[in-house]
Amino acid sequence: MLKDDASVMVGGFLRCGTPARILEEILKNDVSNLTLIANDTSTPDYDRGKLVVNKRIKKAIVAHIGTNPETGRQMNAGELEVELVPMGTLVERIRAAGAGLGGVLTPTGVGTMVEEGKKVMEIDGRKYLFEKPLRADFALIYGSKVDRFGNVFLTGSTRNFNTVMATAADTVIVEAEELSEEPLDPDEITIPGIFVDYIAV
């Protein structure tokens, strides 16, 4: 399903709420030149980090690379393009895509290297950067519990990027920690099943 040159959002914050089993399956296939959209590139020995180490990623759009020295090495060697985006801005760009918006305005990054190549707008005397929405071909997300209709429950911090990414991709695959044959209680649902295309168990 996932092919070369696809753009892929991957939920999680370091190792919390990451669809690690799906990423292991991707590593078993000969898929490369992926554009990764995630909070971070994890660590070299885990999930997103293994994709970097195995040179499956051509571009990473992330907020943080400090826990994976291989990301920095490949970036400095010109082997990997890295677009560093402030974390709040990254989330808002994804949210904007999911909501069908044309972008977001943020004061974060004005007057810094983040501003380079971006449109600066002044509103009521304050400068803002215009940030384009981020959408992907695939979103790989995690679910603490998923029912057979694709409704997802996320516990605690596992919500992180998973909730917003589910709205901003053409195809959404959720990795279920627990699969429920019974429908989830509506009060439990974090991500409605309408956003989910496939369930991986």
How would you describe each model-predicted region?
Residues 1-201:
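Conserved alpha/beta enzyme-core scaffold
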